[in-house]
């Protein structure tokens, strides 16, 4: 039987078990997908168990960056991004990948979001790094903003991007919220309503709540919008393919996540 899990802290409300239960059932595979609460200090011990008994695991906060030092091999893309969200176990060896970046691009394509720049990524943390990397690899001009300007400058220098003030949002054609604003306070948005552009698209990686203030205000401006669920589903589907060689239906995984959210 195939064993999978998501490791992180906290993970009690993770949507990954629901998505991967759908993936296993829809493909006729026998297996389980668990949520293992794993604080940072517990990571080395958990990975020993993964080596012994699991086909693969997903990693979420706060483990994506720390895991690199504990793996036997890390993909070049994950090394550049500096984060691993998917681990494959083969004969006791652990291989690390990042499916957040390709999952983001696949979600845009599936949702009919035009890949037109300039793209402004709000947030220079782990999620922002993956998105900025993906958009740059897709050939877009990428701008980055962060509440702490030094982080935006560091990311811009590392990836060959441009750190900009928030006011440049008016000139962007793709806005991506990769901050936690909206998650911690549903009434908050990282972008004042008057700074949204007149045309383009907006994506929020936050999916609790599903319709954040950022997305509601973008939609009110006439922008094409996408919630955080399609990227969540696509990164999960791509992870599942790395583990099994089979690609589950991302729209089915998204629907499973939506049901688990109760929306």
Swiss-Prot record:
One of its GO terms (molecular function) is shikimate 3-dehydrogenase (NADP+) activity. Pathway: Metabolic intermediate biosynthesis; chorismate biosynthesis; chorismate from D-erythrose 4-phosphate and phosphoenolpyruvate: step 4/7. It comes from the Bacteria. One of its GO terms (biological process) is chorismate biosynthetic process. It catalyses: shikimate + NADP(+) = 3-dehydroshikimate + NADPH + H(+). NADP(+) binds at residues 123-127, 146-151, 205, 228. Shikimate binds at residues 14-16, 60, 85, 100, 207, 235. One of its GO terms (cellular component) is cytosol. Keywords: Amino-acid biosynthesis, Aromatic amino acid biosynthesis, NADP, Oxidoreductase. It is an enzyme of class 1 (oxidoreductase). The active site is at residue 64. Its EC number is 1.1.1.25. Involved in the biosynthesis of the chorismate, which leads to the biosynthesis of aromatic amino acids. Catalyzes the reversible NADPH linked reduction of 3-dehydroshikimate (DHSA) to yield shikimate (SA). Homodimer. Belongs to the shikimate dehydrogenase family. NCBIfam families: aroE (TIGR00507). This is Shikimate dehydrogenase (NADP(+)). It comes from Thermus thermophilus (strain ATCC 27634 / DSM 579 / HB8). The gene is aroE.
């Amino acid at each position: 039987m195939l064993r999978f899990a998501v490791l992180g802290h906290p993970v009690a409300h993770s949507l990954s078990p629901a998505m991967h239960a759908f993936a296993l059932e829809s493909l006729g595979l026998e297996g389980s997908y668990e949520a293992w609460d794993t604080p940072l200090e517990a990571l080395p011990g958990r990975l020993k168990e993964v080596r012994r008994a699991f086909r693969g695991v997903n990693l979420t906060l706060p483990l994506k960056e720390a895991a690199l030092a504990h793996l036997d091999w890390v993909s070049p893309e994950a090394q550049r991004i500096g984060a691993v969200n998917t681990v494959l176990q083969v004969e006791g060896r652990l291989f690390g990948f990042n499916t957040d970046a390709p999952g983001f691009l696949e979600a845009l394509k599936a949702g009919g979001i035009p890949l037109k720049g300039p793209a402004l990524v709000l947030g220079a943390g782990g999620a922002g790094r993956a998105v900025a990397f993906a958009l740059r690899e897709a050939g877009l001009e990428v701008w980055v903003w962060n509440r702490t300007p030094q982080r935006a400058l560091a990311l811009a220098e590392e990836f060959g991007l441009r750190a900009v003030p928030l006011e440049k949002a008016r000139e962007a054609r793709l806005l991506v919220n990769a901050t936690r604003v909206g998650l911690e306070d549903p009434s908050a948005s990282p972008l004042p309503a008057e700074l949204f552009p007149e045309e383009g698209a907006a994506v929020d990686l936050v999916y609790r709540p599903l319709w954040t203030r950022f997305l509601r205000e973008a939609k009110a401006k006439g922008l094409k919008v996408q919630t955080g669920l399609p990227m969540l589903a696509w990164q999960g589907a791509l992870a599942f393919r790395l583990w099994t060689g089979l690609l589950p239906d991302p729209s089915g995984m998204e629907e499973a996540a939506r049901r688990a959210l109760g929306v």
